Every structure is written in structure tokens, then in C-alpha cells.
Design a protein with these regions (language model features):
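N-terminal alpha-helical interaction modules that lie
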Residues: 1-96, 100, 156-186
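Inward-facing hydrophobic residues that define packing positions of alpha-helical scaffold repeats
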Residues: 94, 99, 106-107, 146-147, ...
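Short, charge-rich amphipathic alpha-helical segments embedded
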Residues: 104-126, 151-160
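Extended, well-ordered alpha-helical segments in internal regulatory regions
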Residues: 131-138
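TPR/TPR-like (Sel1-like) alpha-helical repeat modules
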Residues: 138-157
Length: 186
């Protein structure tokens, strides 16, 4: 079996529906050999983290169709990617509410960093993971991660490439104060 992120169009679901969605997906696919790990709810799509034999991927997607129309599918493999491309991908995924994939892309970048840069990238990764928890209706876990994210960002430079780190720090502080996760773009 191989791992995939399946994105279905969101037709009115909210993060509170995450558990219900994963149970429904498991029911719909109960007659096939597949693992539905988790459902994350974004504003425009539902993300299902699944493992299935590649030959059965089409059947799995068809079985999930009562939940929503297919938006896209991504085969999850550890990619060897240049640092700048990893940053670009991480930003793209983050800004499109694909926070788990942002985390994965930025983790590849993190492995190529040293010192303060490594800490800064880890802070952004922790923020992405906090939002991924929010998408599973685990906002309290996500809010708890914000302090670690802020610590990792530390007093790093205001900008990291095209990423406004000062803005991220300020947004994290606002979320800590409000005790809520508020999605924004980086």
C-alpha cells in the first residue's frame, strides 16, 4: 500500500465534522483493503490521508464520491528537492490550506538548514502543524503548539525569502491572545 492525500471539494463541512467524515469514509471503503488515517477540513476541500494499493486508488476515490467531488490527489513520497523549491512548495501548500503538505515540504528544507535558519524553518513547520490539527477539530492541540512555534522563530530576521516572519510572529501572538486559530497566508 502507498500513501496519498485525496482532496475532495468541500460542500459545507466544517472542522467539527472531521471525525464524522473519517468514519463515513471508512464505512464507504469498508469492503476494500485501504486505510483512512484522518480527515482534515479546509474551507475549499476535505483532505483524506489514506493508504491504498495504487491499482485500487481509482476505486477508493469513486467510493468517496458521496462525500464530495475529487479536487486532486497527491502521492506522498519523500522527494529530493532543492531548498528553494521546497520553500516555494511549502508556501504554496500553506497558502492553500494544505498544511500537512506544507509541513512535509518545509521539513525537507529544514533538513538542509543549520543554526538559526533551522530554528526559523522549524517554527514555520510548527505553525503549519498547528493549523493541520485545527483542521481535525483539535484546535486546543494547535493552540498549544503556537508557543513552541514562537520560540523557534525567536528573534530571527524579519524576512525569510518571501516569508514575512514578523507578520507570522504577530499573527501567532494574536491567536494566543484570542485562544483561537485564524488561518492566514504567509
Amino acid at each position: 500500500m502507498e500513501r496519498y492525500m485525496i482532496h475532495l471539494k468541500n460542500n459545507g463541512y466544517h472542522q467539527v465534522h472531521s471525525s464524522e467524515l473519517v468514519h463515513r469514509a471508512r464505512e464507504l471503503c469498508s469492503d476494500m483493503h485501504a486505510s483512512i488515517r484522518v480527515a482534515r477540513v479546509a474551507s475549499k476541500f476535505l483532505e483524506f490521508d489514506v493508504s491504498v494499493n495504487p491499482d485500487n486508488l481509482g476505486m477508493l476515490i469513486e467510493k468517496l464520491s458521496p462525500i464530495g467531488e475529487l479536487d486532486n490527489t497527491r502521492h506522498v513520497v519523500e522527494e529530493k528537492i532543492e531548498k528553494e523549491a521546497g520553500i516555494k512548495d511549502g508556501i504554496f501548500y500553506f497558502n492553500n490550506e494544505r498544511f500537512w503538505e506544507s509541513h512535509e515540504s518545509l521539513e525537507g528544507v529544514w533538513k538542509k538548514c543549520y543554526g538559526k535558519e533551522k530554528e526559523l524553518v522549524q517554527g514555520i513547520i510548527l505553525l503549519a502543524v498547528a493549523f493541520a490539527h485545527g483542521q481535525k477539530d483539535e484546535s486546543n492541540v494547535g493552540i498549544g503548539m503556537l508557543e513552541r512555534a514562537l520560540e523557534k522563530l525567536g528573534n530571527s530576521p524579519a524576512m525569510y525569502g518571501n516569508i514575512d516572519v514578523d507578520r507570522i510572529r504577530n499573527k501567532i501572538k494574536e491567536m494566543q491572545k484570542s485562544k483561537g486559530l485564524t488561518i492566514f497566508e504567509i
